[in-house]
Amino acid sequence: MLRAFRCSIHTSRVLLHDAGVKLTFFSKPNCGLCDQAKEVIDDVFERKEFHNKAVSLEIVNITDRRNAKWWKEYCFDIPVLHIEKVGDPKSCTKILHFLEEDDISDKIRRMQSR
C-alpha cells in the first residue's frame, strides 16, 4: 500500500469528472501522518454520497523542486488538505496535521452548496 502511495504522490490526478470542488493534498514521501491522511481521503471518496459528484483531488509532493513554494509554506505542517470551490480561490479552507473523514465530508458538502 505504501508503494502505491509513493507513486501517486508525484503526480496529480482527477478522481471524478467536471470538478466543482477541488481538494489539494500536500504531503511528502516517508511521512507516516501523510500515509494515514491519504487513507482517510480515500475513505471519503468511497462514500456513496460522493460517487458521481464533481470533486477532484491533486496530490502535491512538497519535496519536489517545482513545489518549493509549498515546502516553505508547509514543511512543518504536513499533511495539509486544501478544499476549495473551483474558480473561487477565496473559498479555500485548510485542514492541517490530522484529517478526519467527517470533517472533510462536511467541508466538501459546504463547498458544493456555495
From Swiss-Prot:
Signal peptide: none
Disulphide-bridged cysteine pairs: C31-C34
InterPro entries associated with the record: Glutaredoxin-like (IPR008554), Glutaredoxin-like_YDR286C (IPR052565), Thioredoxin-like_sf (IPR036249)
Domain of life: Eukaryota
Keywords annotated in UniProt: Disulfide bond, Electron transport, Transport
PANTHER family recorded: GLUTAREDOXIN-LIKE PROTEIN C5ORF63 HOMOLOG
Annotated family: Belongs to the glutaredoxin family. YDR286C subfamily.
Name of protein: Glutaredoxin-like protein YDR286C
